[in-house]
Amino acid sequence: MECIIKLPQRFNKNKSKKNPLRIFDSTVLNHQPDHIPQEFVWPDHEKPSKNVPILQVPVIDLAGFLSNDPLLVSEAERLVSEAAKKHGFFLVTNHGVDERLLSTAHKLMDTFFKSPNYEKLKAQRKVGETTGYASSFVGRFKENLPWKETLSFSFSPTEKSENYSQTVKNYISKTMGDGYKDFGSVYQEYAETMSNLSLKIMELLGMSLGIKREHFREFFEDNESIFRLNYYPKCKQPDLVLGTGPHCDPTSLTILQQDQVSGLQVFVDNQWQSIPPIPQALVVNIGDTLMALTNGIYKSCLHRAVVNGETTRKTLAFFLCPKVDKVVKPPSELEGERAYPDFTWSMFLEFTMKHYRADMNTLEEFTNWLKNKGSF
């Protein structure tokens, strides 16, 4: 997840007041005769590596865990604990998500991202918000622009009000019109499904830490999360650009659906390693907020997305977040010497949206920011 609106002074060298690019249009940029525009070229030490090794991540049989078979539960706890303590990434299979929903949600992305620019801009994200269409970060920065487009939605399982409104479906209908009715229905169902799945994974994470099974589930039952479609167009010089720059997710838990185009890389053991797509498996990773909730026991790891020279890559990401006023504090069983202060998700979200570009030090910089503000 990348959240960039405003940066501290020491990061403002990336701020662009007179960026000549108005919108990210990969079709136009790829047909320029000379080279990729400099705005999208990353520094040499951050450019994609060749011959990246494959990261060995455990595959968790979620159905086995949910069966309550003692042996299967114990094995799932062991695998997830080992991964979460080292790098925070693992795969889940037999997760119960309908294959037709996964397939339809992936295919429907083209309905939006292959639309004319004027159509996509109907949903343009407003400054300071997490919802809407973002065209790289054109117009906001002049360096290290990601080679991607995104469409993001806010979601909460408690969002149904007296008139049974549904935020994902209604947002799409309001911004894009009735022609996107099926589009909205599918992604509303997708967000609801991933929210439910994330709560099951939270049960596993809680048990693997030796705390009550329901502790994290109950903490996130009224979550206020973010659901995002990531569209990484092919690039004629993929060795110069990044689809998403190196960062740790500031959120709690990410569930990522990859397509069959590899692109996810994680920085482990001082090198970039890839997590190639596995059919029907979903990638799960720990975010900064969950790292704070576990008092630093489980890790949020640096990762990035690279792009392909031959084909477009599409992913769907559900970022589980607490209700904005929930206090992020480890359970008593994990407290000991505190690694991070108490904070609310709204405070951390404000920091990542207004003050800091997410990277590997976001949580530490946030802690320092709180100290300087005298918030604790």
From Swiss-Prot:
Family annotation (SUPFAM superfamilies): Clavaminate synthase-like
- Names of required cofactors: Fe(2+); L-ascorbate
Keyword list, A-Z: Iron, Metal-binding, Oxidoreductase
User: How is the cofactor bound, in the record's words?
Assistant: Binds 1 Fe(2+) ion per subunit.
Found, by tissue, as follows: Expressed in roots. Detected in leaves, inflorescences and siliques, but not in stems and dry seeds.
Q: Name one GO molecular function term.
A: metal ion binding
Q: Which residues bind Fe cation?
A: H247, D249, H303
Reaction(s) this enzyme catalyzes, per UniProt: gibberellin A12 + 2 2-oxoglutarate + 3 O2 + H(+) = gibberellin A9 + 2 succinate + 3 CO2 + 2 H2O; gibberellin A53 + 2 2-oxoglutarate + 3 O2 + H(+) = gibberellin A20 + 2 succinate + 3 CO2 + 2 H2O
What Gene3D superfamilies does the annotation carry? B-lactam Antibiotic, Isopenicillin N Synthase, Chain
GO terms, biological process: gibberellin biosynthetic process
Query: Where in this chain does the record put each Fe2OG dioxygenase domain?
Result: 222-322
Instruction: Return the protein name.
Output: Gibberellin 20 oxidase 4
